[in-house]
Amino acid sequence: MNRFVKGIILLSIAAFFAECLEFVVNMILARELGEHGMGLYMSILPTIFLIIVIASLELPISISKFIAESNPKLHESMLRHAFRMTAIFTAFSTAAASIALPFIPVFDTYHPFIKGIVIGLIPVVAFTSIARGYFMGVQKMGKIAIANVLKKIIQLLCLFLFFQWYSFELDMAVLISLFVLVVSDVVVLVYLYSQFIMARRALSGQQHIHLRGKDVRKRLLAVSIPTTGLRIFHAVVNAIEPFLVKGALLAAGVAGTAAIDQYGMLAGVAVTIGSFPAFIAHSLMVVMIPSISEAYALSQYDIVLKRLKQSIFITLGYGIPAVWVMFQFAGPLTHLFFHSPEAQYYLQLLWPYFLFHLFVMPLQACLIGMGFVKEAFYHNVWSHIVALSMMYVLGSMENLQMLGIILGMNTGMILLTSLHYATICKALKVSVFLTGGTRTPRIEG
């Protein structure tokens, strides 16, 4: 069994446990916060993730790609320069967030301490990214797997202890829920860095080649900037989406409180359940980026095509049964959160969104590994423009409302998957059935 398959299996098993824990975490949140509180929690979360994405600078991807493509003798010098770059960028990001957050109106309706939580997350996420990227690049997926499970265990334990022993007002309960995220990320930081330090000590006696800081920054940023742009775009869309959905529902005649509740059912229940199988897709993505990067750098295009086929067959193998189960048992699954017929209805209607989302992640990993980050970004822009436009136009129709929102989500995900797949087939000079040549011309534009 090669490293690629081993990495997928290891990460998938760990991610399964992590997703099970995440499922329980969301059940606790749903019961403790209630429908309205869950809507508030899910509405602020995308904005927090947007700030975190900017702080991380997508270093896990750029560092893992550098490590996979380059001589091991270059790794130590690259890591030193990456630390310096991260320290400078983190100082700037923390200062900028401290100044800007008080003026962001999204936080006005929440506990004032939430701003401090977000600021505290910035350095934690930034420095964790270096260790995470290193272990991804050397394909030591066991460290990543343990970190992912550890994060969910700490989050679950903290939530259980806080809500078991104490009773909070709604705004304080939301604050506690977000504070737990910081605690779990700090624990992951400590674990990964302890492993990272031991790994570097093991390499200390080996010969290293010195790199210029300018060259390292240029190479890392060549990947980090477009992938960060892609993540920022996703985070911006996710931050806008709650307000766009609520705005569309208000235009359709739905009351404000009911609109928040419906969005809580959509994002907090239906999407949470539907996204459960995505732990395998995410595992595929993490393993594929360094694997595709290494093969593409060595012009081993047949290996790239092999990895693509493997990812598609794996996705078909688990994706179709998973979506079928969610459709058939939507009622019992949604009742684990709330006894809400709306959530069951949303989960069943979103099956195309969930199925195609499972394909998007490995396809996007293939594009990133091949160096087509810009193409991936354009695909996301166009698909989200179509999706958000449809969501607002159809969602604001009185006879459609949430059905229109879901139609827009499904259409956008199908379009994004199709664009990714078509670009990869064109790059590898193969047909849509993945047959033909494997010599790769560079895509321009």
UniProtKB/Swiss-Prot annotation:
Record's GO cellular component terms: membrane
Membrane topology: Multi-pass membrane protein
Primary subcellular site in the record, as a coarse category: membrane
InterPro entries: MATE_MepA_subfamily, PG_synth_SpoVB, Polysacc_synth
Regions crossing the membrane: 7-29, 39-61, 82-104, 109-131, 144-166, 172-194, 237-259, 269-291, 312-334, 349-371, 376-395, 400-422
Location in or out of the cell: Forespore membrane
Keyword 4Fe-4S: no
Keywords associated with the record: Membrane, Sporulation, Transmembrane, Transmembrane helix
GO biological process, one term: sporulation resulting in formation of a cellular spore
Misc note: YkvU and stoA are cotranscribed under the control of sigma E.
Protein known as: Sporulation protein YkvU
Species: Bacillus subtilis (strain 168)
